[in-house]
């Protein structure tokens, strides 16, 4: 089993966990590519990415080009003479010159079973769509968006209560060992590259704050999935009015689907210790954990203790 000289490209904590796994393996990380330091916190001080922090702790050279399209950046990368480049949530597009620079090309760790969800938000979209299974795909990168040949896939279940946070953590635990298995066997025939069937693919579009607004004209089951998919960001929300007619926005962290009823969508059916029940187009969404502006998330009962007038029975929410 040959030790590989690896360029690692990644930015968030999810990527840092993969970098740590490679550092713990027999392979050598000769350089790290990550996005530019970003302002963070109240003071808006520049903060290094988790990947950069880990690289610096291990005395690995760090490169932070704003783009890899320029010839200078491409020449710099090629001069590293890497065996392979591993890309995990890097955030920059890799042009063909970069894809071709390492001897064995570029590998990507993708947070779904391809080709089901290509694009930026595969973890969130798998919950949003009601998938019962997802996993991790290690892919040989090409110029397309997550269209490369698949080297290895490992599956995991999506539980009925799964949020994007919990599924992210599950995949972050699963994926690094899958990556190391591929790297260990990259130059033998253990993993045979498999072409993707593009007709089976969907685009996992980024989430937006606009999409997170609960639309009571949607099915209750879809709204419940939205609440789980949009946690930890952007968090599903809706608005009601207080006794003075002022709009009050509430974020929703947990809900359940109850049987069908015949009231117009958006009607508040009940509000008590068991939850705040709101009619949807085909059923009832029972809101269990909510967060008013400026407060921490709380149970429906705790919310109603001080704000029951926000949820008058029969009121129709927009």
Swiss-Prot record:
Gene3D superfamilies according to UniProt? Formyl transferase, C-terminal domain (3.10.25.10), Formyl transferase, N-terminal domain (3.40.50.170)
Catalytic reaction annotation: L-methionyl-tRNA(fMet) + (6R)-10-formyltetrahydrofolate = N-formyl-L-methionyl-tRNA(fMet) + (6S)-5,6,7,8-tetrahydrofolate + H(+)
Q: Where does (6S)-5,6,7,8-tetrahydrofolate bind?
A: 112-115
Q: Which UniProt keywords apply?
A: Protein biosynthesis, Transferase
A GO cellular component annotation in the UniProt record:
cytosol
InterPro entries noted in UniProt: Fmt, Formyl_trans_C, Formyl_trans_C_sf, Formyl_transf_N, Formyl_transf_N_sf, Formyl_transferase-like_C_sf, GART_AS, Met-tRNA-FMT_C
Q: What is its EC number?
A: 2.1.2.9
**Top EC group:** transferase
Coiled coil, from the record? none
Gene Ontology molecular function: methionyl-tRNA formyltransferase activity
Superkingdom, natural source: Bacteria
Q: Entry's HAMAP family? A: Formyl_trans
**What this chain does, per the record?**
Attaches a formyl group to the free amino group of methionyl-tRNA(fMet). The formyl group appears to play a dual role in the initiator identity of N-formylmethionyl-tRNA by promoting its recognition by IF2 and preventing the misappropriation of this tRNA by the elongation apparatus.
Q: Which family does it belong to?
A: Belongs to the Fmt family.
| UniProt cross-references to PANTHER family, sorted A to Z | METHIONYL-TRNA FORMYLTRANSFERASE, METHIONYL-TRNA FORMYLTRANSFERASE, MITOCHONDRIAL
Q: What is this protein called?
A: Methionyl-tRNA formyltransferase
Organism field: Haemophilus influenzae (strain 86-028NP)
